[in-house]
Swiss-Prot record:
The keyword Phosphoprotein does not apply. The lineage of its organism: Eukaryota, Metazoa, Chordata, Craniata, Vertebrata. One of its GO terms (cellular component) is cytoplasmic vesicle. Its main location: secreted. The keyword tRNA processing does not apply. It comes from the Eukaryota. Keywords: Amidation, Cytoplasmic vesicle, Secreted. GO terms for biological process: neuropeptide signaling pathway. Stimulates the release of gastrin and other gastrointestinal hormones. Belongs to the bombesin/neuromedin-B/ranatensin family. Disulfide bonds: none annotated. It is found in: Secreted; Cytoplasmic vesicle, Secretory vesicle lumen. The modification Methionine amide is found at M10. It comes from Pelophylax ridibundus (Marsh frog). This is Neuromedin-C.
Amino acid sequence: GSHWAVGHLM
């Protein structure tokens, strides 16, 4: 699955 940081930080 994807991580939450990919949409938050990136």
